[in-house]
UniProtKB/Swiss-Prot annotation:
Role description: Prevents misfolding and promotes the refolding and proper assembly of unfolded polypeptides generated under stress conditions.
Gene name tied to this protein: Hsp60A
GO molecular function, one term: ATP hydrolysis activity
Name of this protein: Heat shock protein 60A
Subcellular location as annotated: Mitochondrion matrix
Family of this protein: Belongs to the chaperonin (HSP60) family.
GO CC terms in record: mitochondrial inner membrane; mitochondrial matrix; mitochondrion
Organism of this sequence: Drosophila melanogaster
Cleavable signal peptide: none
Cross-referenced Pfam families: Cpn60_TCP1
InterPro entries, per database record: Chaperonin_Cpn60_CS, Cpn60/GroEL, Cpn60/GroEL/TCP-1, GroEL-like_apical_dom_sf, GROEL-like_equatorial_sf, TCP-1-like_intermed_sf
CDD domains: GroEL (cd03344)
GO biological process, one term: mitochondrial unfolded protein response
Residues of the transit peptide: 1-57
Amino acid sequence: MFRLPVSLARSSISRQLAMRGYAKDVRFGPEVRAMMLQGVDVLADAVAVTMGPKGRNVIIEQSWGSPKITKDGVTVAKSIELKDKFQNIGAKLVQDVANNTNEEAGDGTTTATVLARAIAKEGFEKISKGANPVEIRRGVMLAVETVKDNLKTMSRPVSTPEEIAQVATISANGDQAIGNLISEAMKKVGRDGVITVKDGKTLTDELEVIEGMKFDRGYISPYFINSSKGAKVEFQDALLLLSEKKISSVQSIIPALELANAQRKPLVIIAEDIDGEALSTLVVNRLKIGLQVAAVKAPGFGDNRKSTLTDMAIASGGIVFGDDADLVKLEDVKVSDLGQVGEVVITKDDTLLLKGKGKKDDVLRRANQIKDQIEDTTSEYEKEKLQERLARLASGVALLRVGGSSEVEVNEKKDRVHDALNATRAAVEEGIVPGGGTALLRCIEKLEGVETTNEDQKLGVEIVRRALRMPCMTIAKNAGVDGAMVVAKVENQAGDYGYDALKGEYGNLIEKGIIDPTKVVRTAITDASGVASLLTTAEAVVTEIPKEDGAPAMPGMGGMGGMGGMGGMGGMM
């Protein structure tokens, strides 16, 4: 029998294994486009049912805890994973549309998904009849630019708290209580203020506004407590000693203590840490002679801590000791180096500094500096931290506590609150247009003037024209009426005239408070057209072939059957 050399045999086997590990399934043309479109349809159908005031909820199974009930388009889109790989690719591409829209505008994900499906479907149909996909994409993009320009022209600024409440109410699925709460929060902390959403502990929604600088570090020692009402430290008109370095030596803080004593004002020390004889001296003097003093660890880590301490220094009119820029030693401290605040409240978990005495010009300059950093950063985490710092400096933080009788109810409501909050911010940023899909319908007539260079580009414009009808049609369909009839009636009118799906009547949507943020509508059509028109240009799709499970049985193990002879061991009884 002929045998291969061992090395050749091994290389042949390893090549087979490599091929098995990297085997791909490649499909072409109309067949694969049809499969991707099936995936797009499944995802879009699941998301579209949530659209409009009479949209339904979707229940999503979770690997842990209770199923999630939501009406949030992006949450539904993210949850969808299809078994067929080619269908799943179609679904995932439209999922990206929803994600992109959510990241940029914070709302409008359902509109984006509905538009993406319409553009992809029409595009595939035209390509199957011989149209050039690249030219169709160019036509789509030309049409979308015209739509965006028209939306900008239609847009009007949001100015009153009532308009803010209307935007929030629409995005919260018609929940007026949420709309009013968000409007109130924005009124209190300003348009640039930070509004955070947390789980409440009661059945009702609550709004708490934290003014001044609050951070999550409490007193180092409970011996600093001076209030009979709860375990906290309360000072009025206090001095602030800020240090970037750890304080261990008592000699370094004696000058500051003497200054505070001479001024007859309490002293709050905020440093990287305070320990050793410095801490024990403060505690002993607090207990024995009633020295008005408290020590707190500085919040954050690394550069973030350094920046936060500088914010505090600017807000209170002091300096940060230990900072490389300020070469002043703690021992050489003067009164002008200490910050001043009107009120201080310190609990075991957090510290609140109110009414800082810093110069307004310095605070404004610092706030503008942070705004520039927010624009430059690409990290979401970094952006969030910068916005928190900006809010502390500017106008405080509003805390929305979402209440409910169960975790499922609270989570569902939180999704709507987040949507409403994002929509409101978008409206403040770029203004509003008539809602209910009307703004997109008003853009249709403007597409007549789009200049194209060939017939296929004209087809691309026509695809967008048809897609623009879909949001209004879907909202009407979910409300149980004939979508095509509603679209035709709204198209025959002009301006802000549209369909109120909640009440089932027509009228001026701006007057009715049915409005969409311009940024949300613009982002939805931009993201939907970009991904969907690219999808239509695909001619081949490559996926991995799943590896077969189960390793082959080990050879030679069959001989172990002889162990049956061990039955004779029964005689040992």
